[in-house]
A protein has these predicted regions:
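A detector of single, family-specific signature residues
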Residues: 1-168
Length: 168
């Protein structure tokens, strides 16, 4: 029984891979190191037609990664993600964020920057959620504008001290 289910799973994964490869922009998403067929197929299955979203913030809201602040009166509470969205999409993006931090140099640098910056350093989990939200913006730009993945643009978010930016 286990063998038959395992072979059926392999057959379904081959079918999914064939279908994903037929989608025109899916190949561009697969160019990112650390993003695989399961990621792209899961993302496209959960999101559907990307053209129905006007901006990446709507996609973040769909995934439940929109930021909400818990405040009342003069009390300023902690800012967290809303979690009001598709749980599977959020889980998928979190898993991909972990994969990207371990396998992709640009995302690793970004994670390192988020966790070690002097002003407002993030905890590791917060950093992974920020990277998941960043990945949504990258996917959105690649799918809607048709641009290629640019590693230099990824690291442009990192604010370096003026000392490093001056010419020698």
């Amino acid at each position: 029984d286990y063998e038959s289910r395992n072979t059926r799973l392999q057959e379904v994964m081959v079918l999914i891979e064939e279908l994903v490869r037929k989608i025109p922009m899916a190949e561009k998403l697969l160019e990112i190191k650390g993003v695989g067929i399961r990621t792209v197929s899961g993302f496209l299955a959960e999101v559907g037609d990307i053209s129905r979203f006007n901006n990446p913030k709507e996609l973040q809201k769909l995934a439940g990664l929109a930021l909400v602040e818990n405040s009342s009166g003069k009390h300023k509470g902690e800012t967290t993600i809303s979690r009001r969205g598709r749980k599977r999409l959020r889980y998928l993006l979190f898993e991909v964020a972990m994969s990207l931090v371990s396998k992709n140099q640009e995302f690793r640098e970004l994670h390192n920057y988020y966790t070690t910056r002097r002003l407002n350093p993030l905890k590791k989990m917060q950093s992974l959620m920020a990277i998941a939200a960043k990945l949504i913006r990258v996917f959105y730009a690649m799918l809607t504008k048709g641009v290629d993945y640019d590693p230099k643009k990824m690291v442009s978010d990192i604010k370096r001290p003026a000392v490093y930016l001056q010419a020698a």
